[in-house]
């Protein structure tokens, strides 16, 4: 059975910098700093063997390879290496003539629950003179389990577990059991039959282009007659549903629910 309820969420952060590398071939003799390109990365862990790149950047290219160690800071980490994730290597090398390299990490899908809040802090082990105090040498990595999308997971019986409309206009209703079916004429769309009132269906579309932001889209559509909802004739005789422009509506394939504003 599916569940339909309400909510939202979102967070992001970045950091970067520039200066020079001291070699015989570079006229600028400023310090050579090395750091992670981002201070925060969220990884969508799927049921595959995919490795993700965590970029490392230097402020200048040098004429020699630079190899750094990669440490996991246990006191800032609750994900367990070997159980929740694995590193391809505990070192990272910036090749001669280059400014970037990648620490490669893989999440272990079967050992991560959708409700887990797992993350780790990685630290580059480098010479003291290579550390830029402004940005430091750490980065935080968050593991987020992403289940494969299958629209048929949302087909069948569904329970509307809460709605502000219930409290305002359907006083004796706290939950509502409805049926849903896949719309044969629209991609990734389901029809929620008799959503609030018999004869009035609602359609919602599932977006699948961003694994970390599985959003719901809904076009404006009528969901009741004014006579049935308000016991009066008003306007075009219909009450319309509009998707909020202020809050995100989203779904979870892992938990089989949609959260609609």
Feature map (PLM): residue ranges:
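Acidic/polar, low-complexity intrinsically disordered N-terminal segments immediately downstream
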Residues: 22-102, 106-161
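Ser/Thr/Gly/Pro-rich, low-complexity flexible regions
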Residues: 146-261
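C-terminal motif of bacterial Sec signal peptides marking the signal peptidase cleavage site
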Residues: 17-20
